[in-house]
């Protein structure tokens, strides 16, 4: 039997600038939003930065020796996650934001966006695969990936969506890279 987990996204947040404060902000966002839970599931222990997060949110855990053993013995065999788009983070004033999803933040000037403000970033998928594998050395499965768009239903019931086909093709090619 193989046990997996579901992570709501990949480590797809880029610093908007090369300012070290932006780099550190992204690192903190990934630790809090992705790695905190993924590390527990895949490594069987709370990460070194967990106490900082607990303090930030006023959490006081009473972790028993039995809890430690349970975590160590309850790790997953594979990582599964959703990937739709990437985001940016910055400590600087933002003039243009991306919208339409939970990853709202500064708009990445190197990416294109769909009509709802989701970034189109197949390289971000490749990056997330690389990061997850480097961190966990476990099989990976992208279980959600797609493109939302306003489609036109033709009279014969078909939808002509070459833009969606191009999106899927680019993301499959990124996985093969």
Question: Where are the model-predicted features located?
Answer:
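Active-site region of glycoside hydrolase catalytic domains
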Residues: 1-177
